[in-house]
Amino acid sequence: AAARKFGPADAEKISLEGYDFIYIGHGKCRNLSAVSEHIIQYREEFTRAFEAGTVFLVTGSARLLFGKSFETLDGKTHDALGLFDYTGKEFDGLTVHDELLHPVFAPEETVFGCVNRSENLYFKGENPSPLFTVEMGYSDNEKTGGTEGTLCKNFFGTWSLGPMLVRNPVMMREILRRL
C-alpha cells in the first residue's frame, strides 16, 4: 500500500473551552511554521481564552506563536496569533545557557532556568509586559541582562525551558494562585 500523506484535513481540531490551564512547550522553528499555519484559524478562540483569564504557560520558541509574526531562516514570514506586539526571527546558530531570573510578581525570589534557542523576539521599544528581570542570561533578543518573558493577565511566556514549575516553587505557587 502507498504511504498516506497527511494534510490540513488531518490536523487536530483545537478547542480551548473548559480549560483552566494551557501549556505549550518549545519546538524547532521549522515545526512552528507548520503549527502556525494550523493554529492561526483559532486566533479568536485563543484571544477569548486569554481575555477570559485562562492561565497560559508558554515556554521556549512556542512564544513565537503568540506575537504578530515570525521569520524563519529561509526568509519566509509566518503569521502568528497576534496576542502580543512583538515579532520573532530565527537566527543561524544556537544560544544555550543557564539563567537566573527574578519574577516581576516576586522580585526578591530567584528563578532558575535553561535556554536552548535559535530565535529572538523584537518589540517596538521596550517589552511592555516582562515576566522577569534578568540577573544572568539573555533578554528576549540577543542582549544580556534587561528583561525576559511575558506576563500579561494570566499569560506566562518565557524562553526558559525549566523545568520551570518543578524547579521553581515561586512560579508554581503563582500559577496555582491564578487558577
At which residue positions do the language-model features occur?
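Flexible gly/pro-rich beta->alpha loop and the following alpha-helix that scaffold active-site loops
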Residues: 2-58, 63-73
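Hydrophobic/aromatic beta-strand patches that form the interior of the parallel beta-sheet core
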Residues: 4, 23, 57, 82, ...
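Short coil/turn connectors at secondary-structure junctions
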Residues: 18-19, 52-54, 76-79, 108-111, ...
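Glycine-rich nucleotide phosphate-binding loop and flanking beta-alpha elements
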Residues: 29-30, 63-65, 120-122, 164-166
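Short glycine-/acidic-enriched loop or helix-start segments at secondary-structure transitions
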Residues: 33-35, 66-69, 93, 125, ...
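Short, glycine/charged-enriched secondary-structure capping and boundary segments
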Residues: 36-39, 70-74, 97, 129, ...
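Pocket-forming structural segment of enzyme catalytic cores
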Residues: 73-148
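Acyltransferase
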Residues: 155-179
